[in-house]
Amino acid sequence: IIGSFYVIYYQLEKINVKTFVGITIGLTIGLLISFADNLEVANSSLIIFFSGMIAISGMILPGLSGSYLLLLMGNYTLIMVDSVNALYYTLTEIVSLNFEFINDPERLYLLKVLVLFTVGSISGLVFFSNILSSLLKNHKSITISIIVGFIAGSLLGVWPWKNEDIYGNVSLFIPDFTTTETWTTLFFLFIGILFVVLLERLAHK
């Protein structure tokens, strides 16, 4: 995510009042999402559908990813892990002519989640692609600046060093730099940033 921030930031041609306002708007949205309590409302069919639309827009906009947006919304595990696993197990059972899954409410719910997410993604691709392309073409600076602010503000939502109490309240903390675990985390953090930056440079060669 930090690597994506670096890449997208340098797409800003210049910093002026308009781009500053855009960064502020994006930063505010990102911070609100990062500090929002109980953002996960994954049981709602409508939310799952819109999650698909939002996730696919992350694939269209530079510097964002659908998985990252799902993580921020709190439904990454439900959609990308649980429902995908449910599909795999279901297909495996169908091949084995085992149809007992139709009596499993949890399995059927997860398959429904995957269908809703897929329909939402397709709808988002059709609905958002032209709009986002137009924004990037005609209002590139303000669009990019909002994305830059959003990425910066939402970084706290994926901060790896956090504690959660029995009530679900999350608090962030600064890691202990005397431990091997911290330096291992920082090493892979650096590798991830380097990988994204190198990919971007190779793409422009």
Description of each model-found segment:
Residues 1-61, 65-205:
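Multi-pass membrane proteins that catalyze or facilitate reactions on polyprenyl-/lipid-phosphate substrates
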